[in-house]
Amino acid sequence: KLGIVGLPNVGKSTLFNSLTKAGAESANYPFCTIDPNVGVVTVPDERLNVLGEMYHTKKIVPAAIEFVDIAGLVKGASKGEGLGNQFLANIREVDAIVHVVRCFEDSNIVHVDGSIDPIRDIETINLELIFSDIEMLERRIAKAVKVARNDKAVAKELELLERIKAYLEENKMARSFTVNDEDEQVLLESYNLLTYKPVIFAANVTEDDLANDGADNEGVQAVKEYAEKEDCEVFVVCAQIEQEIAELDDDEKKMFLEDLGLEESGLEKLIKASYSLLGLISYLTAGEPEVRAWTIKKGTKAPQAAGKIHSDFERGFIRAEIVSYDDLMECGTYTAAKEKGLVRLEGKEYVVQDGDCLLYTSPS
């Protein structure tokens, strides 16, 4: 699940509407998004259409991820300003963040701080996330102090908590914090810190800045430099244009993008990047009834991947017949791939790769 965050009036809800076509109320005033709007978004994957043609399939089922449009944040959110407490509670529930940053001038759309400054806006939100995390760490530290004297494990955790807190107090994000060992890593992940969640920046621009990916937009360049230091990705989008594209059918959309000099929409890139940011990949199953992308975490072994289809497949797993999508395309048919020795039998320890086409064998 990804949370779309940003200051009020930066284009969050417009972007969310484009992603989900959900029609979330998008108004030119702060806090028009009070309850988070949730939408399930399909992940673009051209491989499914190709397999669909190969197998003359009746149904194509793409992978999907969930996006949540979270209320606009303001300074002082960690102290309850605006919808701060609600915002922070909502964002704690997501796995990763799409941070929408305003990089366009428009006198008709008010900015809460009265001027356009993308880095200031990013840092405003980061500070509120930091303050919220520090507050949470302080509560944990207060509890740990009471028992640390008589419990070595708690004493060790207390030392970690204090190190993380000191790190955040330097206005740094927990995702760049360095742990000393695997135990500390497990603890760090268990705290569900807002500043530990992975982030993608969506630089929202005007139509004029789209064709050259915001190369002439100083705000976009500043965001890219900032993101590089934070080891985050940046995608240039025009939320208004994306909303228009979302209303078109496939042929119209293709023509529209060609007119803009684009191969794919900014949102398609953003969705794919978001899927990857969550550490997700797709393996594929194909046949006449359906072609489907199954979502798994990177590093998932074959039995657990099989369990995504049905729990019986995981319990009774023996082996899987696997061919990579690229090998299948090169050979033209599954039979030809098998004749060339490109279809492999893999056992319980096999780690499934993105684009693997699988056929499972289990006890009869």
List the predicted regions and their residue ranges.
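C-terminal-of-GTPase-core extension/linker across diverse P-loop GTPases
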Residues: L2-V5, F16, K146-V351
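Conserved nucleotide-binding/hydrolysis micro-motifs of P-loop NTPases
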Residues: K21-A22, R47-L48, G72-V74, R102-N108, ...
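Inter-motif core of Ras-like GTPase G domains
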Residues: N85-R102
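Conserved G1/Walker A P-loop phosphate-binding module
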Residues: K1-V74, N85, I91
